[in-house]
């Protein structure tokens, strides 16, 4: 703060300096989490687009990282207007970005599970149609090694026997013409950071309507947990068929069709 | 007596150590039955502020020596516990039972001779497998509280159904469900059941190694015992003997139903950890915390069970 004021003073006293570009000042707002990696990640993810921390978007996660290989996060930007992109990242992970999602015809909501390699800020960033980025997040305490320990499927040795298994279901959500899709994959999501196990991860996924309209598409990175599970809210009505296609770094494709149930199952558990 | 002196010494030392974290365990045994004291652990998650001393511990006075059921999280705790227990009874500790593998109950055995430490064979196997990881986790969370604590395995496998100490007989029951090997003890003289972590009372049950159907079977066996009161693994003493059993069962039944309903209605893990907790559990400490841990333990399995396969052959 004091340094900022000093700079302002300097600028005020030296009118000439005002004409000089880029006074080595970060174009990004001060990080409320004081992360050592904030500016580096901001430069990479946001570039020259405007950024602000905004309480209207919510990055939700449990109060304890019970399993550093699989930490649940949900990024909810419903109610802030049209959204172009949603990025979930953890500043101090060796693979910081977990998911980069474009909700083309979907509510701006995504939930998944990520690896945590140490105590780190975990963040959600949402880009509005205007180009403005909104950011939220918090520090999460975690035991180390989520990215650098071998996946369970490698230890039990049965990952290949189940590779490509997908499970999923979709339910209508009230009156909004939206449906909630849950999809899970069996995949080791190898980070490449474990000795003698090269990177092997699902790297993209699309969700289309039965007529082929793109509803949502995402890039995934190996910091998504083993056996990825993803929740989205595409804008389709009950009875529609959702077509999910994913591809991994070996070029293997994964395809599934999930019909949207006619009835909501929300009687079973209260929807948040 | 020893505690008073310790507290006094701590007080005298305060000016010299001002600014340093206080890492002295204050152990307050409370007499619950004739010749049995309970040390009530903090009904909270393991945290630096409590030094990991969250598990309940029993001290039992017998004609031939002092018995302990569980030993706390660290060498320092185990040493303090030994001094307090021997000061109380005037007899040396001759047996330490470890009820199950978890480190809040068993890392304190580092302060004792392994030859007097007894546990179920399954618990010893599990401690050999997971002990190193538990130790790392406690060092990370507790720092200096753990100084000097080494992983020690119990030297005696419990295979007998009871053990007699100069006429005071303890029934030893090999059960499971909270973990793969859960020891429960019944003091025949007083009818006190010492349930280990099969019993939680006004403190939400923890499930990192749980098998819920086996846990229910074990609770059935405990409910049928001729006991008068129960000392749970966590939470206050249960003078009725049945309340902790009923409460533990109520929670694990609700937990399984709630998580199943959450998976079947499309909630993700974050949302499942946020579902309302019924009002009847309002008095349960650490309820939201344990629910969210349990989501982590059970959700992938429930998804595999309830979400239908949807993949098409690779084309």
Predicted regions and their residues:
Chain B
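C-terminal regulatory/interaction regions
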Residues: 265-315
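Active-site HxH/HxHxD metal-binding segment of metal-dependent hydrolases
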Residues: 78-79, 83-161
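Active-site neighborhood of phospho(di)ester-bond hydrolases with catalytic His/Asp-centered motifs
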Residues: 69-71, 95-102, 118-120, 194-196, ...
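Metallo-beta-lactamase
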Residues: 22-31, 125-174, 179, 188-189, ...
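N-terminal export signals
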Residues: 1-23
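Conserved beta-strand hairpin/beta-sheet module of binuclear metal-dependent hydrolase folds
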Residues: 31-84, 184-196
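Active-site-proximal loop/helix segments of hydrolase catalytic cores
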Residues: 169-225
């Amino acid at each position: 703060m004091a340094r900022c004021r000093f700079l302002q003073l300097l600028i005020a006293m030296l009118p000439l300096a005002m004409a000089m570009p880029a006074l080595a000042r970060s174009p990004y707002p001060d990080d409320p989490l004081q992360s050592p990696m904030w500016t580096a990640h901001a430069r990479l993810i946001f570039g020259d687009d405007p950024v602000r921390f905004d309480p209207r978007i919510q990055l939700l996660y449990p109060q304890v990282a019970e399993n550093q290989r699989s930490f649940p996060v949900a990024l909810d930007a419903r109610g802030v207007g049209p959204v172009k992109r949603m990025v979930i990242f953890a500043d101090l992970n060796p693979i910081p970005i977990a998911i980069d999602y474009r909700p083309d015809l979907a509510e701006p909501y995504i939930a998944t599970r990520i690896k945590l390699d140490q105590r780190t800020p975990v963040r959600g960033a949402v880009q509005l149609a205007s180009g403005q980025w909104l950011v939220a997040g918090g520090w999460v305490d975690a035991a180390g090694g989520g990215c650098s320990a071998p996946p369970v499927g490698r230890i039990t040795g049965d990952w290949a026997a189940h590779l490509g298994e997908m499970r999923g279901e979709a339910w209508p959500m009230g009156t909004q013409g939206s449906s909630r899709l849950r999809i899970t994959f069996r995949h080791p999501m190898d980070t490449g950071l474990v000795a003698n196990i090269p990177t092997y991860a699902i790297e993209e996924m699309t969700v289309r309507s039965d007529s082929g309209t793109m509803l949502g598409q995402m890039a995934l990175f190996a910091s998504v947990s083993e056996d990825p599970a993803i929740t989205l809210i595409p804008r389709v009505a009950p009875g529609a068929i959702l077509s999910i296609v994913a591809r991994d770094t070996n070029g293997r494709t994964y395809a599934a069709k999930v019909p949207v149930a006619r009835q909501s199952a929300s009687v079973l558990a209260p929807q948040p | 007596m020893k505690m008073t002196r310790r507290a006094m010494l701590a007080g005298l030392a305060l000016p010299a150590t001002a600014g340093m974290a206080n890492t002295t365990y204050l152990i307050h045994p409370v007499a619950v039955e004739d010749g049995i004291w309970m040390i009530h652990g903090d009904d909270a998650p393991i945290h630096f502020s409590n030094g990991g001393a969250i598990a309940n511990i029993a001290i039992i006075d017998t004609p031939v020596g002092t018995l302990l059921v569980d030993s706390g999280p660290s060498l320092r705790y185990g040493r303090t516990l030994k001094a307090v227990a021997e000061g109380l009874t005037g007899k040396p500790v001759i047996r330490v039972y470890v009820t199950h593998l978890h480190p809040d109950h068993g890392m304190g055995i580092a302060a004792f001779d392994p030859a007097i430490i007894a546990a179920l064979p399954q618990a010893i196997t599990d401690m050999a497998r997971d002990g190193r990881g538990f130790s790392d986790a406690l060092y990370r969370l507790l720092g200096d509280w753990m100084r000097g604590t080494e992983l020690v395995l119990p030297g005696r496998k419990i295979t007998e159904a009871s053990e007699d100490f100069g006429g005071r007989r303890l029934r030893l029951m090999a059960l499971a469900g909270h973990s793969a090997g859960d020891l429960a003890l019944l003091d025949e003289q007083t009818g006190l059941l010492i349930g280990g972590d099969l019993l939680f009372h006004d403190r939400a049950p923890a499930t990192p190694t749980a098998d819920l159907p086996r846990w229910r079977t074990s609770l059935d066996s405990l409910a049928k015992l001729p006991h008068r009161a129960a000392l749970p693994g966590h939470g206050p003493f249960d003078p009725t003997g049945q309340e902790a059993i009923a409460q533990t069962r109520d929670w694990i039944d609700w937990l399984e139903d709630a998580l199943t309903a959450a998976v079947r209605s499309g909630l993700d893990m974050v949302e499942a950890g946020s579902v309302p907790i019924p009002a009847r559990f309002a008095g349960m400490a650490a309820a939201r915390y344990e629910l969210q841990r349990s989501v982590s333990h059970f959700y992938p399995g429930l998804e595999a069970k309830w979400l239908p396969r949807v993949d098409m052959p690779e084309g």
